[in-house]
Design a protein with these regions (language model features):
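Residue-level recognition of beta-strand termini and adjacent short loop/turns
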Residues: 8-10, 25
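Short Gly/aromatic-enriched secondary-structure transition segments
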Residues: 45-51
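Short N-terminal binding/cap micro-motifs at the start of the first secondary-structure element
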Residues: 10-15, 40-41
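Glycine-rich beta-strand-centered segment in the early N-terminal region that forms part
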Residues: 21-36, 51-101, 109, 120-121
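Cys/His-rich zinc-coordinating "finger/knuckle" motifs
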Residues: 46, 107-110, 118
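Short, solvent-exposed secondary-structure boundary/capping segments
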Residues: 43, 82, 111-114
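Short structural boundary motif marking the start of a folded domain
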Residues: 1-4
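Cys/His-coordinated zinc-binding microdomains
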Residues: 104, 115
Length: 123
């Protein structure tokens, strides 16, 4: 798979043609990315803006990019039945645990334990 790696704060971005394809779990979906934006958050993290950088758990090399669209390439055994391989999709990059007080109130966007694709997790 192709990817843009950020190898370190303020280091040049690197284009990688042979990045490993993630292995999915039974309840996950693999999306073949067709388009991905690099937004202000990505640039701020790359520049090392302290307040923003310290709010994420970033390991380098990082694959930024949380604004994306693509097609479903693979479905886990327990993926939702309304999804199909080849379907065009986008996704919310925020994961949530459904156990914290915010999730209980439906405010999953501020979950206490929310990893984020493109920052905490590879984009």
């Amino acid at each position: 798979m192709n990817a843009i790696h950020c190898v370190g704060r303020t280091e040049p971005w690197q284009y990688v043609e042979d990045a490993p394809i993630p292995q999915i779990k039974d309840d996950e979906v693999l999306i073949e990315i067709k388009a991905c934006g690099i937004c202000g958050t990505d640039h701020s993290l790359h520049r090392g803006q302290e307040a923003l950088f310290n709010s994420y758990d970033i390991t380098f090399p990082a694959i930024f990019g949380h604004e994306f669209s693509g097609v479903i390439a693979e479905l886990g055994a327990n993926a939702p039945k309304n999804l199909e391989v080849g379907m065009r999709v986008t996704a919310n990059p925020v994961l949530f645990d459904n156990t914290c007080p915010y999730c209980d109130k439906g405010m999953v966007n501020i979950c206490d334990n929310r990893p984020f694709y493109g920052t905490d997790l590879p984009g």
